[in-house]
A protein has these predicted regions:
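Active-site beta-strand termini and strand-to-loop segments that position acidic
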Residues: 10, 94-98, 143-150, 253-254, ...
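Membrane-interface helix-coil boundary segments and nearby low-complexity
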Residues: 1-24
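Structured beta-strand-rich core segments of catalytic domains in phosphoester-bond hydrolases
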Residues: 29, 49-154, 162
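Short, solvent-exposed loop/turn elements at domain surfaces
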Residues: 25-29, 223-226
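Soluble or luminal CAZymes and related metallo-dependent hydrolases
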Residues: 28-36, 55, 86, 135-138, ...
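Metal-dependent phosphoester-hydrolase catalytic domains
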Residues: 1-7, 183-191, 197-286
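Residues that flank catalytic or metal-binding motifs in active/ligand-binding sites
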Residues: 13-16, 88-90, 136-141, 153, ...
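Active-site beta-strand/loop signature of hydrolases that rely on acidic residues for catalysis
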Residues: 16-22, 36-64, 143, 156-160, ...
Length: 286
């Protein structure tokens, strides 16, 4: 969708984002993804934007057939499964239909054919995937939103799952590309969020290197100890000297972080976590 948006809002808006790596590799991916989705949607703050990583094909099908998703969200990868072929999992982004609308629907509402609330919604501009240099065929799922305060520009939402394990040099290249996407001509800024696989000290330097804002650091300061924002290995027994890590992040450019919290996974069958990752919930001002 590349039509020019209409009826842009000029006032500042607050949006909420939830990001969660739902772990495709463990058993029962559909059951676990449904529990995570239920937890997200039953939370005290209904999210405007949902970033999901490690979505297996079966979990994708379950999400797309979920009545709440169908009635309440605009969803990427709904029309075909191209991005899920030849890979064990991919990313998906869900946008609240209360806060976001397509250009066509926005035009209809402006003309009085809708419910007359088109002006309260931000308008979807385009969706694409940017291939990244990756050992695992990872990409960045990009959703462009018509920027409320900058006519003709877009607000860019990047859902990412960076390379794993010892691929730090690839993660550095990936972050260079992602930071560049937020600084492209016509982009007023945006969000990079998801599983950064930040397991080494050098990984945590990449946000500052590219002059981006790490929402957790900006709002909480501490990145160590029980309140340090760890999202992996939390509340479980770890072996081989491993410690909980802040693998998942929300970083931004040109936006104001307001709140960020870690969402703990529950258990399925009293012993299996919904995911080996916690989720992140962040609110920010555009």
């Amino acid at each position: 969708m590349t039509q020019s948006p209409r009826g842009l809002l000029l006032a500042q808006q607050t949006l909420s984002l939830t990001s969660w790596n739902i772990q495709a590799s463990q058993s029962r991916p559909v059951d676990r993804s449904e529990l995570i989705l239920d937890h997200i949607l039953k939370g005290p703050k209904f999210p405007d934007i949902n970033f999901l990583q490690e979505v297996a094909s079966t979990a994708r099908q379950s999400l797309l057939s979920n009545p709440r998703v169908r009635s309440s969200f605009l969803t990427t990868d709904a029309e075909d499964d191209t991005s899920f072929k030849g890979v064990p999992f991919a990313t998906m982004t869900l946008l609240s239909s209360k806060r976001f609308g397509s250009p066509l629907l926005a035009e209809e509402e402006e003309e009085g054919e809708g419910e007359g609330k088109g002006g309260s919604k931000m308008v979807l501009d385009s969706v694409f995937r940017m291939e990244l240099p990756s050992r695992y065929e990872r990409d960045a799922l990009c959703v462009n939103i018509a920027a409320p305060a900058v006519p003709g520009a877009v607000l860019r939402l990047l859902n990412v799952h960076l390379d794993s394990l010892d691929s730090q040099f690839r993660r550095a290249l990936q972050m260079h590309i992602l930071a560049g996407l937020l600084r492209e001509l016509g982009c007023s800024g945006g969000i990079i969020a998801g599983d950064f696989n930040a397991i080494l000290p050098d990984d945590h330097m990449l946000v500052d290197k590219h002059e981006l804002v790490d929402a957790w650091v900006a709002l909480h300061g501490s990145t160590t100890g029980p309140d340090g924002g760890a999202t992996w290995g939390v509340g479980v027994e770890l072996r081989d000297g491993l410690k909980p890590g802040r693998l998942d992040k929300v970083v931004m450019l040109g936006l104001q972080p307001d709140e960020i919290d870690v969402l703990q996974p529950g258990l399925i069958d009293a012993y299996m976590p919904w995911s080996d990752h916690c989720g992140l919930r962040c609110t920010f001002t555009v």
